[in-house]
């Protein structure tokens, strides 16, 4: 699957009328499928899509299309199914762009089976899997009305409820009703067919005057045919939310059971369905809750079995960000090589480089473009078991950050030029695609670097989120993660200046830290550390830091030394900077917390015992890279926290009805904020009142979010300019990129919105 920038669909013949009776155009169809993508994709993702196309409109002949054409875009997911007549490659529609392609093809109808493809462990090859749901097609015989269909539907529902299954109704957009039932455990298509047939036969026995389970058309007059056969692995059903190629643009529309009690029940048109989605969301939300909507890590996951390999295999969809880390891993596989990975759009774009990157400009080295890897892989070291994909030992050879000059990794004319800043390797490199997945890696001449050490332009080095449990003390040092505000401090022979992580001069905001000037009066130093306020147990408290007064005791805990008496230390190894820092602390009253004992697991347990926020692991040979988020520093927290940008607010209810009830959260992305959900828990009345006052001058009519919000979240909101940063605690990220069970921790005036990234 290609990157978002590679997935484009151009609408042609937009004004072409496809439904003459209503004047509905191809552009209308395009807009419809874009509008239903969020709710429809879960019900078709992972399944082979058969299309029924009306390129010249519904008043002209249509045709079914199964085989994916050679002209189909390369980013479209696909898989092959063996039939009696041969093999067929089907598209798998698992993205909004895929649905846009459906509309561009004038494929008004999308038909899918009740099973999904499953990946073979190791190879990642997709093969037909078991059924994940049942479907019953209630087909009315001559003279049967919708009220009779509804009566049979309720009988099916009650029969399935007796065996613990829930049922969801869908008006088919044609004449009948479809009933869907999610299966707690997938079963073979044959097993699903047998079960569905038994249900239909039992219903026929209970309601012989109204129901038939027999396919013979001559026996259907005045009855409802409960078609159980569409559960067969070789059959398909019109997908929920699909348009129908009839005179009017009706839709296979999910309904409520209450609606089936309405004598005036009828089929719905596409514009009615869009209105309902905006109001009600997806009525089939529980049908395909585990739908495997594809993302840039789909191929990576298919090639690995989480029960057999220690490699990180995240289930959540990667979130686009602007991180710029790189890692080179020494991979002792069957064919030893190096893996070069660049963080890009929420994943690690990866190449296997047999001879590593060249160390001079006179040679080129082969690089093989491989599957995107998760960001967590940047800190992975370990042994992949024999028999698994990529079996062998993986060791981090180098890591750091990079600057981008050019980044085009499209399937045809790829070219990437980056400037690496690592511990063992640095400089400008070009990777140029030559044929397919084969690239050439070339070292370029460096442009003159005129950077000098200036405190006013200095930004703190940042850590990547990861797990420290497998890290060894021989290579890593472990510090406590303190729940305070990050500060850079310059003390110059009796004068002191403080700068926040965002670059603001905050010297006046910390009168309690003026003593640093006297403590370090004999030196000119630049320190990196944390301003903390301790609770009664001696543990840094973010809440007390937030609500501190001028008389509150604030301490500065130093953890890095960047400059000492005329010598810049940015290029010095961490373990050497640490020794200098400890020497400085021994000669002054500077507070330098001790390193945590043992390997990563022991350090993590120690920090938990003391009630600290977590652990920061730092490679002992790492250099300090200002303003960069690097894999050579890893943070691992005992609870999940996330910085967010406030993009709007919703009025409260009850006691909060006159003010802010909850805040809309976002993570900055290329097109605006990426919606991350709402937070209201943990906000005190005082904080709510202060927030309302702070947000008032930021009100705007324009949404700061990159896509329209779901209907349930967009109701009754006031948008604001994305200027305020906050921090929340949460239980997990959902597959849709939302924070689950979020609770408020406080504003982060020390952070800029542009600095916020998904942890």
Swiss-Prot record:
GO terms for molecular function: ATP binding; DNA binding; DNA ligase (ATP) activity; DNA-directed DNA polymerase activity; exonuclease activity; metal ion binding. Binds 4 Mn(2+); 2 Mn(2+) for polymerase/primase activity, 1 each for 3-phosphoesterase and ligase. Mn(2+) 4 binds at residues 483, 613. The record marks 373 as: Transition state stabilizer. Disulfide bonds: none annotated. Its EC number is 6.5.1.1. Residues 747-759 have a biased composition (Basic and acidic residues). Keywords: ATP-binding, DNA damage, DNA recombination, DNA repair, DNA-binding, DNA-directed DNA polymerase, Exonuclease, Host-virus interaction, Hydrolase, Ligase, Manganese, Metal-binding, Multifunctional enzyme, Nuclease, Nucleotide-binding, Nucleotidyltransferase, Transferase. Mn(2+) 3 binds at residues 331, 337, 339. Residues 13-16, 26, 53-55, 63-67, 71, 83-88, 104, 137, 215-220, 227-235 bind DNA. Residues 740-759 are annotated as: Disordered. It catalyses: ATP + (deoxyribonucleotide)n-3'-hydroxyl + 5'-phospho-(deoxyribonucleotide)m = (deoxyribonucleotide)n+m + AMP + diphosphate. It is an enzyme of class 6 (ligase). Substrate binds at residues 52, 111, 137-139, 172-178, 230, 236, 244. Mn(2+) 1 binds at residues 137, 139. The keyword Transferase applies. InterPro entries: DNA_ligase_ATP-dep_C, DNA_ligase_ATP-dep_cent, LigD_ligase_dom, LigD_PE_domain, LigD_pol_dom, MtLigD_Pol-like, NA-bd_OB-fold, NHEJ_LigD. The active site is at residue 481. With Ku forms a non-homologous end joining (NHEJ) repair enzyme which repairs DNA double-strand breaks (DSB) with reduced fidelity. Recognizes, processes and reseals DSBs, including repairs on incompatible DSB which require 3'-resection, gap filling and ligation. Anneals the 3' overhanging strands from opposing breaks to form a gapped intermediate, which then can be extended in trans by using the termini as primers for extension of the annealed break. The preference of the polymerase domain for rNTPs over dNTPs may be advantageous in dormant cells, where the dNTP pool is limiting. In the N-terminal section; belongs to the LigD polymerase family. In the central section; belongs to the LigD 3'-phosphoesterase family. Monomer. Component of the NHEJ repair enzyme with mKu. This is Multifunctional non-homologous end joining DNA repair protein LigD. The gene is ligD.
């Amino acid at each position: 699957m290609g990157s978002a920038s590679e997935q484009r669909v151009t609408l042609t013949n937009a004004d072409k009328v496809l439904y003459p009776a209503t004047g509905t155009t191809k552009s209308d169809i395009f807009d419809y499928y874009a509008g239903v993508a969020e709710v429809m994709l879960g019900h078709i993702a992972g399944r082979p899509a058969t299309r029924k196309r009306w390129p010249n409109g519904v008043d002209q002949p249509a045709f079914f299309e199964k085989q994916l054409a050679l002209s189909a875009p390369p980013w479209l997911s696909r898989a092959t199914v063996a039939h009696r007549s041969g093999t067929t490659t089907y598209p798998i529609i698992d993205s909004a762009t895929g649905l846009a392609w459906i509309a561009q093809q004038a494929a008004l109808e999308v038909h899918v089976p009740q099973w999904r493809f499953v990946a073979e462990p190791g190879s990642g090859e997709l093969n037909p899997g078991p059924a994940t749901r049942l479907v019953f097609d209630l087909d009315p015989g001559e003279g049967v009305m919708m009220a009779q269909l509804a009566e049979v539907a309720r009988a099916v529902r009650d029969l399935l409820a007796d065996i613990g299954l829930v049922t969801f109704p869908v008006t088919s957009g044609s004449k009948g009703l479809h009933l869907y039932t999610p299966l707690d455990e997938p079963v073979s298509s044959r097993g699903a067919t047998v079960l569905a047939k038994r249900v239909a036969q039992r219903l026929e026995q209970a309601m012989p005057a109204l129901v038939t389970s027999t396919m013979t058309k001559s026996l259907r007059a005045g009855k409802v045919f409960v078609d159980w056969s569409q559960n067969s692995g070789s059959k398909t059903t019109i997908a929920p939310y699909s348009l129908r190629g009839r005179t009017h643009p009706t839709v296979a529309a999910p309904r409520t059971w209450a609606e089936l009690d309405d004598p005036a029940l009828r089929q719905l048109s596409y514009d009615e369905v869009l209105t309902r989605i905006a109001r009600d969301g997806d009525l089939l939300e529980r049908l395909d809750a585990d739908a495997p909507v594809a993302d840039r890590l789909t191929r990576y996951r298919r090639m690995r079995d989480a029960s057999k390999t220690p490699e990180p295999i995240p289930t959540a969809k990667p979130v686009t960000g602007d991180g710029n880390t790189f890692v080179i891993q020494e991979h002792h596989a069957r064919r030893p090589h190096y893996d070069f990975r660049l963080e890009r759009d929420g994943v690690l774009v990866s190449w296997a480089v047999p001879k590593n990157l060249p160390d001079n400009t006179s040679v080129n080295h082969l690089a093989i473009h491989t599957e995107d890897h998760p960001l967590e892989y940047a800190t992975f070291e370990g042994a992949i078991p024999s028999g698994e994909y990529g079996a062998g030992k993986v060791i981090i050879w180098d890591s750091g950050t990079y600057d981008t000059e050019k980044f085009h990794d499209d399937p045809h004319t790829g070219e990437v030029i980056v400037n690496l800043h690592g511990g063992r390797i640095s400089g400008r490199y070009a990777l140029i695609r030559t044929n397919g997945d084969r690239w050439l890696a070339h070292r370029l001449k460096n442009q003159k670097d005129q950077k000098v050490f200036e405190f006013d332009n200095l930004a703190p080095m940042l850590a990547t989120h990861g797990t420290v449990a497998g890290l060894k003390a021989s290579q890593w040092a472990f510090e406590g993660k303190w729940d305070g505000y990050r500060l850079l401090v310059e003390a110059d022979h009796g004068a002191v200046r403080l700068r926040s992580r965002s670059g603001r001069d905050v010297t006046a905001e910390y009168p309690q830290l003026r003593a640093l000037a006297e403590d370090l009066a004999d030196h000119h130093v630049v320190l990196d550390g944390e301003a903390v306020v301790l609770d009664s147990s001696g543990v840094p408290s973010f809440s007390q830091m937030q609500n501190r007064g001028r008389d509150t005791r604030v301490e500065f805990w130093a953890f890095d030394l960047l400059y000492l008496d005329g010598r810049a230390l940015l290029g010095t190894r961490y373990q050497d900077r640490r020794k200098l820092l400890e020497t400085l602390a021994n000669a002054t009253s500077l507070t330098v917390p001790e390193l945590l004992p043992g390997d990563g697991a022991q350090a993590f347990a120690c920090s938990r015992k003391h009630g600290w926020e977590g652990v920061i692991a730092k490679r002992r040979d790492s250099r300090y890279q200002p303003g960069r988020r690097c894999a050579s520093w890893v943070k691992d927290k005992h609870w999940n926290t996330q910085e967010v940008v406030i993009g709007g607010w919703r009025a409260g209810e009850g006691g909060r009805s006159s003010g802010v009830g909850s805040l809309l959260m976002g993570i900055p992305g290329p097109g605006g904020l990426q919606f991350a959900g709402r937070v209201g828990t943990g906000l005190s009345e005082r904080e709510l009142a202060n927030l309302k006052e702070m947000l008032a001058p930021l009100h705007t009519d324009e949404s700061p979010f990159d896509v329209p919000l779901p209907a349930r979240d967009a109701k009754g909101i006031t948008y604001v300019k994305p200027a305020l940063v906050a921090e929340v605690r949460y239980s997990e990220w959902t597959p849709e990129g939302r924070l689950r069970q979020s609770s408020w921790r406080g504003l982060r005036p020390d952070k800029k919105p542009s600095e916020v990234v998904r942890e």
